[in-house]
Amino acid sequence: MTEQTTTPDGLVIVDKPSGFTSHDVVAKMRGIARTRRVGHAGTLDPMATGVLVLGVQRATKLLGHLALTEKEYLGTIRLGQDTVTDDAEGEITSSTDASGVTRASIDAGVAALTGRIMQVPSKVSAIKIDGKRSYARVRGGEEFEIPARPVTISSFRVYDVREAVAEDGTPVLDLVVSVVCSSGTYIRAIARDLGAGLGVGGHLTALRRTRVGPYGLDAARTLDQHQEELTVMPVAEAAASAFPRWDVDEKRAKLLLNGVRLDMPAHPPGPVAVFGPDGAFLVLVEEEKGKAKSLAVFA
């Protein structure tokens, strides 16, 4: 990471505060970085805190590919109440005594939601249904269904189970959990589905994103800290840390920059960062039929 006093060119890792939308953070960063060319890789709900990866200037071209990486969360799930939003921001729609739910049944429910699963996203979300945001359809009183889609929950752990009493007097259980998952996973939906499977309902009461791909809380700074001293990860460093690396000689570098599809060495599926003989980050590519297909040029 380097500290900048002029308009930066790279990634900015923010520890998002509760109450801010991801767009709020982008708007704030536009002022701090003195440029409108700012975007983010993966939305965080207003209630949630934690790692939000921003791209500034040329680094915005990395964001769509960074958004596809694995994410890690810490959160609290309340068993015994459903809400319209599947989190604590929404109105409670049902309450059920959860005091009889056992740890064994919780563990079984967690196991059923681990691995490759089909998940229905929360209705109050930014997902588009026939071109219209799902939350806008909910606000308009529309009746609709969101199709399930595949997601991967690599890890779902319960660290603590706490007995509590909700404001309406319902005995509930609060679970302190961690989740490692693929892009596009809704943690709110995990809370909802765990509660539904246990027959008592459930929603998310707290969420903190601790990692996006290789970028964790140790690399994140608050908006106030960035306002005081903006810290930027250069594009080349960001690419090298997030994607497999392919070093090429000068001849191959020129061919790749001109869009020639060269044979690629074996790499895991997904984007690969190409570096020239001088160590400069040149282009992001992916394998297609054994050849390098250009995704974004940075040279």
UniProtKB/Swiss-Prot annotation:
EC number: 5.4.99.25
Enzyme class: isomerase
GO molecular function: RNA binding; tRNA pseudouridine(55) synthase activity
GO biological process, one term: tRNA pseudouridine synthesis
Keywords assigned by UniProt, alphabetized: Isomerase, tRNA processing
Catalytic activity as recorded in UniProt: uridine(55) in tRNA = pseudouridine(55) in tRNA
Classification via InterPro entries: PsdUridine_synth_cat_dom_sf, PsdUridine_synth_N, PUA-like_sf, PUA_sf, tRNA_psdUridine_synth_fam2_C, tRNA_psdUridine_synth_TruB, TruB_C
Active site, UniProt feature: 45
Gene3D superfamilies: Pseudouridine synthase, PUA domain
Function: Responsible for synthesis of pseudouridine from uracil-55 in the psi GC loop of transfer RNAs.
Family: Belongs to the pseudouridine synthase TruB family. Type 1 subfamily.
Stated name of the protein: tRNA pseudouridine synthase B
Species of origin: Streptomyces griseus subsp. griseus (strain JCM 4626 / CBS 651.72 / NBRC 13350 / KCC S-0626 / ISP 5235)
Gene: truB
